[in-house]
From Swiss-Prot:
Participates in various redox reactions through the reversible oxidation of its active center dithiol to a disulfide and catalyzes dithiol-disulfide exchange reactions. It comes from Tissierella creatinophila. Belongs to the thioredoxin family. Disulfide bonds join 29-32. Residues 2-44 form the Thioredoxin domain. Keywords: Disulfide bond, Electron transport, Redox-active center, Transport. It comes from the Bacteria. The gene is trxA. This is Thioredoxin.
Length: 44
């Protein structure tokens, strides 16, 4: 899993070969927290 920001978004996402899953989230977002274990499953 890669943490994205302005400096690497284009290279890691827009220029990536293949499929990329980008998860936008916030520590205060309860639905985001609920999905996080499933996002980690994709990483494996």
């Amino acid at each position: 899993m890669i943490e994205l920001d302005k400096s690497n978004f284009e290279e890691e996402v827009l220029k990536a070969e293949g499929t990329v899953l980008v998860d936008f989230w916030s520590p205060s977002c309860e639905p985001c927290k609920a999905l996080m274990p499933h996002v980690h499953d994709f990483e494996e």
